[in-house]
Design a protein with these regions (language model features):
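Fold-level recognition of mixed alpha/beta catalytic cores in primary-metabolism enzymes, strongest
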Residues: 119-173
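Gly/Ser-rich catalytic/binding loops embedded in alpha/beta enzyme cores
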Residues: 1-136
Length: 173
């Protein structure tokens, strides 16, 4: 309901999310080993390739299309037990024009970058953690505008495989 104003989500399926959460609960109850992020919901920017949900990259050209392989970082999240809860909005191709997302603290303002949906989803308490990408400020600016922490790791530390590329030498996850 809140997302009607913030518009943080490009893809969110509540039914699938609740099924994944139930499976995580059952896994924990079974006594099987769990990962360090077991059951933690994580949002991801809609340029991270996924096989089980659309990766539209903010453009109608990719409407409803998925990747044939997950982004490596998505596989790492799954291996750690995290639940990918959905895709957050981005500007078209993570580059063109402002995204439709609004700042959850003032709907008349923008979160300020292509990872706007990621920052807004955390700032509005819709997601505890969200992954974004940055070429020229797309993580740190929206995080700052939305009052949350944006972390930009060392270049190349996190694989960019199966993530829409804007600039090979500048893109960060």
């Amino acid at each position: 309901k809140f997302d009607k104003d913030v518009k943080a989500w490009a893809h969110f399926d509540k039914k699938v999310l609740l099924e994944k959460a139930s499976e995580a609960d059952e896994h924990r109850r079974s006594g099987k080993p769990v990962g360090p992020l077991h059951g933690v919901p994580v949002a991801i920017k809609d340029i991270f390739g996924t096989v089980d949900m659309p990766t539209e990259c903010g453009t109608v050209i990719r409407k409803g299309k998925s990747y044939s392989q997950n982004a490596e970082v998505v596989d790492l999240l799954h291996a750690a037990g995290a639940i990918v809860m959905g895709k957050t909005t981005t500007s078209e191709l993570a580059y063109l024009g402002p995204p439709k997302t609004t700042n959850p603290h003032d709907y008349s303002r923008t979160p300020g970058g292509s990872s706007s949906g990621s920052a807004a989803s955390v700032a509005s308490f819709m997601a505890p953690i969200s992954l974004g990408s940055q070429t020229g400020g797309s993580v740190i600016r929206p995080a700052s505008y939305c009052g949350v922490v944006g972390y930009k790791p060392t270049y190349g530390l996190i694989s960019r495989n199966n993530i829409l590329r804007t600039s090979y030498s500048l893109d960060h996850v």
